[in-house]
Amino acid sequence: MTEQGGEALYQVAVRALCEFSAKRGDLDLRFTPSPSALEGIAGHTLVTSRRPAHYQREVALDGRYRHLQVRGRADGYDPQANCLEEIKTHRGDLALQPANHRHLHWAQARVYGWLLCAERKLEEVELALVYLEVGNQKETRFVERVRADELRLFFESQCQAFLAWAEQELAHRQRRDRELAALRFPHAEFRHGQRQLAEAVYKAASAGCCLMAQAPTGIGKTIGTLFPQLKAMPGQRLDRLFFLAAKTPGRALALHALRSLEGETGGLPVRVLELVARDKACEHPDKACHGESCPLAQGFYERLPAARAAAVEARWLDQARLREVALAHRVCPYYLGQELARWCDLAVGDYNYYFDLGAMLHGLAQVNQWRVAVLVDEAHNLVERGRRMYSAELDQGDFLGVRKTAPEALRKPLERIQRAWNELAKTQADDYQAYDEPPQKLLLALQNAVAAINDLLAEQPQALEPALQEFYFAILQFGRLAELFGEHSLFDIEKRPGRNGRSLARLCLRNVVPAAFLAERFAASRSTVLFSATLGPRDYYADLLGLPAGTPWLEVDSPFSSEQLEVHIQRRVSTRYAQRQASLAPIAAILGEQFRQRPGNYLAFFSSFDYLQQALDVFRQAYPWVPCWSQTRRMDEAERRAFLERFVAGGEGIGFAVLGGAFGEGIDLPGERLIGAFIATLGLPQVNPVNEQIRLRMQSLFGDGYDYTYLYPGLQKVVQAAGRVIRSRSDRGVVHLIDDRFAQAKVRRLLPGWWQLR
């Protein structure tokens, strides 16, 4: 939204206008390999490079229709031929292109055509759809010559179809900003430390900068960041706010906090959308995403306008409400959510919706030139999540399985991969080795395989079985990250025994410093606030996350006193691997004695499932009268919920869990639901060849290899787990840190300052 001469105008991109008004038919996601974004850019560059010197590229155009301001860049215009071109890249036989795609492309060309005629006072113009096949680089042209008055009528019809929506959006935005400016904090007063956090968030939003905020567990960080950021939206002319969480509980807390802001009138003026993974939203997982298979894909774009209108009217669109709206209009809930990401004010979702290489929210913000603010919940998780997002892996065992069943057309390209792979494995003497760069011969073989699969799919769009399609996606990701390879990543090969005495190799492009990728996402937002109870040391997170130089770091004062939490260091126990067997009986005695002194609910954390099980067996034998329950491998949501439901006020028992797992952070067990924790580990990552390579890279980049690789990540998990105990100023509890290394001065300095260690 903008103002011109005191009049409010709704700005819309040509592409967004046409996608709103000109899409029709079924949702059709039958897999065909579209060109990548980089291939699309290269294709546009190639086509325009073939044009004469007077050819004009990226022609900026805009026009008005009542309250609409329509803007965009036409791909190219030849003034001597009076020909405007809309360029699209594709693969394979163009005859296989769905008709609704061509219809949309013509709509874009005609809108650009009118904007050009209006600006240059042309009576007519030749419009050309130019399709470039990225494999053979051949152009196919579809041409029509259209009078300006015809184009004007088409432009006005598209705008008219969008106008009622735009006027509704203008009214919503004005009301939203007016009511957000008057938004009141939902509680009678701020908690201790919460006002300090809220003021810092508001200042960062107003200044348009990033903020790192370390705030103790239990002060209400979620509402303490959401409230000031919402208040800042009108003054900063923000279009969207993204609340990003690492795990499902973080999303749930955000939605709960937003509900509290509705007040007695239920009048929170923002449209809230919860984004969930496709597999959790799909109504027909046994069907393919196209109209011939799934009833919710058939006629999707015909039914979308009514579903979209009902959804924005509802405003509150968590997973349950969105599903209700979607099914009422017989459209797919997941893809309705994807569409509504364009029209919500506040999206709540996983990190990957903004930070992943192909992230949807980031892409929408860029295409629509939104001014956005980003809140990153439990931001200490972004280091490891970022590393995973920007890494890629290829497993030779999976590849051999794919090769056995692949179509004949792929036999030779896959053989080339196998030969290159085997050569790598033969030259490597050790089971694990890191290299300075990815192997060029293998990368070339992968590129050839991608081209061959593309050719196959261009002729047979449904030719890939699931395993081959998954491998195709894997080599695409591997190739993309190989192009971006730098000192932020490692390339390593790990060998393991296979059949017949042969070894199999796993190749990994392993990102270890996500800063280079994340920095661009921070730069794309007006303001980003990263908050967590464990966001220190400051330099560690600033270095690995790529925050702008000078990003302020806030440590919020703890509202809790040392009298609330007894912290005991058990100096006579070592949980090092070599001493684990000897540690089991002393650990059982510590747990049993604490439970005898003060019966209640406790959590006991261990470094692995094996260690947990050994400790549990010894404890049960020594204290059979103490109720116990334990975390198990690969628990589903129902099992995790059942584990937590054992922690009831007035209850007694000890839950055994793995440090860094589902119960070490992001759970809220206030009051008597949890009165203590035992942490029998420093949480240090395992010393292995991979982590040792990471340590060497951290040392060369930051001069602090051991701490960056082992100590800081480990103690972050310890502090998070201990933070489950004290959730309010009325709580009282105890934490036992079971390992002699907790007494080391270097380790003690990294523990919360308000703890009084005993």
Regions found by a protein language model. Give the residues of each.
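Metal-dependent nuclease catalytic cores that hydrolyze phosphodiester bonds in DNA/RNA
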Residues: 1-82, 107
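Mg2+/Mn2+-dependent nuclease catalytic core
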Residues: 61-155
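Conserved pre-motif I regulatory segment
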Residues: 172-214
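A substrate-engagement module of RecA-like helicase motors
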Residues: 178, 184, 237-347, 352-355, ...
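Walker A/P-loop
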Residues: 206-228
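Signature of the SF2 helicase/ATPase Hel1-core->accessory helical subdomain module
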Residues: 225, 231, 252, 329-346, ...
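A contiguous, basic/glycine-rich beta-loop/short-helix subdomain that forms a polymer-engagement track
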Residues: 322-347, 357-365, 455-574, 582-583, ...
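Conserved RecA-like P-loop NTPase helicase motor core
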Residues: 571-582, 632-742
